[in-house]
């Protein structure tokens, strides 16, 4: 996975925003009544402008802790969870994180130690691993 930086995030956001505007116009022209019946299908791009993505910048994670590269950000779909989640990568390997009902976060490495943010979960995993490599977590 390429290194996630703010520049890449903003570039992707700009491309997504310009593509969402073009796609929404074509979709409305093709089916005028379809927009009124949309119930948030995951195929419909959510952000309509770059300004809509600015609140997500603090959620982007790209840092080095104790020599380990940590990247992460909001992620749609994948795994057995529904809706929008958060993906965290430790040295390019996905660290499975999950949000609890109370808003705290856990990871597959520090499952019994909930923390307030995905960033804190990644940092706790780095501490727990003590330099060991993260083994990919199987999907099934």
Swiss-Prot record:
Which GO molecular function annotation, any one, does this entry have? Answer: copper ion binding
Family the entry assigns: Belongs to the melC1 family.
| One family name in Pfam for this protein | MelC1
The known PTMs are summarized as:
Predicted to be exported by the Tat system. The position of the signal peptide cleavage has not been experimentally proven.
Give the protein's function: This protein may function to deliver copper to tyrosinase.
One GO term of the biological process aspect:
melanin biosynthetic process
* Signal peptide positions on this chain: 1-36
Q: Could you identify this protein by its name?
A: Tyrosinase cofactor
Q: Which organism is it from?
A: Streptomyces lincolnensis
Instruction: List the keywords (alphabetical).
Output: Copper, Melanin biosynthesis, Signal
Entries under NCBIfam families matching the protein: TyroCdyMelC1 (NF047833)
